[in-house]
Amino acid sequence: MTNEHKDQIRIVQETVAGKEITFAHVMGGPDPIIYQKLGLNPQVDYGSSAIGIMNMTPPESAVIASDIAVKSCNIYIGFADRFTGTLIITGEISDVTSALTQIIDYFRDTLEYVVCKVTKS
């Protein structure tokens, strides 16, 4: 070992996924092309429709979030991935907003997750 490397320390840093909802967003009245590009049902009333998207860790949490969403509001599951923690729901704007809020509340209050606010566009 040369002198220039003698005083260097090698640090290995690992991250562990925590219990967290990192993203929760409602897209009110999205353009029909967004439905098509996401592979969602394009046969909806676009005037009052919405898409809700969430991301969470650990990724299996998306299964629980899906269950809460369908039991709490009149929404449809567009996509739920237990490997990435992504959940996409569709429905009326009020139902999608309410479902995301119900999920956030349950994960924060019951499961003690760190959660974000629900944002809207």
Which role does the model predict for each range below?
Residues 1-66, 70-83, 90-121:
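Positively charged, small/polar-rich N-terminal and surface patches that mediate targeting and assembly
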